[in-house]
Amino acid sequence: MTTEPISAAEIARARAEHPLAFRAPLPVRLRRAALWTGFSLLIAWCLYDFGFSPIRIWEGLGRLGRVLSFMFPPHVWTEWREFSEILKGLGETLSMAFLGTLLGAVFAFPLSFLGAKTINRLPVLRFGVRRGFDVIRSFETLILALIFIRAFGLGPLAGVLAIAVGEIGVLAKLYAEAIENASNKPVDGVVASGGSRLQSIRFAVLPQVLPVLLSVTLYNFESNVRSGTILGIVGAGGIGFLLADRIGAYRWDEAWSIIFLIIAMVYLIDWLSGLIRARFIGTWEGAR
């Protein structure tokens, strides 16, 4: 099958009959130009206000290269006392992330039903609950840790509470969205069979959303392991405290060895959580 080329006259006739198909109207073009100009001016102002310059970037890269050169050779702990301190810090960070995620999930699970429009039919109550989720999420975990450190003192307890409170807002919102996206057909089947509203939630909604809730919780746990490292730097204990101590003392070889251990721990947790998702969700995709 062959097609003949379109002549210039046909193109000109089509342009005359349908001008908007070839070029946007003038108001649209002006609006686009204004948006792109404002966007470019905003970027330029940010770069100027932040002191961006090629010379500064080049000098910073040089200093960064010197810091990275301290990675080799990495430090190897020869005394069990020093290495046990590092392992204890890793264990504290892992415990903070686990307990904080667990406590957050325990409180977020029932609250998510109050925030789901398919379950809570009271708009005023649902609106208040959802805005409460927003208020909790507006506080960064690091800020919560500083507040709890002032209240409960230094140590992992402040980190656990900071992660737990932050997770309530995040997990409750994600749980509520998963519940809202559940299909209503199983619910209608349970109700048609004479089941109550609670039974429809138990036997129709939960089987659909539990795999999603598990996947979200595991992902947040992985993220909280990394957050636990940062919380340790501000005094919440864990491996972050030891890392900040080594960096402050310019013991870069030990600092980089600790960073390597953190990377290995995060990788191991990701692998294990992938196996758990594969076991309960029925797919090995997350474990690849």
Language model features: what each stretch is:
Residues 1-102, 114, 118, 281-288:
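N-terminal, non-cleaved signal-anchor transmembrane helix
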Residues 133-164:
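Generic hydrophobic transmembrane alpha-helix motif, especially the helices
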Residues 197-231, 253-262, 269, 273:
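Transmembrane alpha-helices
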Residues 111-145, 174-177:
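Cytoplasmic-entry segments and transmembrane alpha-helices of multi-pass inner-membrane transporters
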Residues 87-95, 129-136, 222, 244:
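Alpha-helical membrane-interface segments at transmembrane helix boundaries
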Residues 150, 227-262, 281-288:
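Glycine-rich helix-loop "coupling/hinge" segments at transmembrane-helix boundaries
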Residues 182-199, 203-209, 236:
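Short helix-to-coil transition segments within interhelical loops
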Residues 107-111, 158-161, 165-179, 183-187, ...:
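Membrane-embedded alpha-helices of multi-pass transport/permease systems
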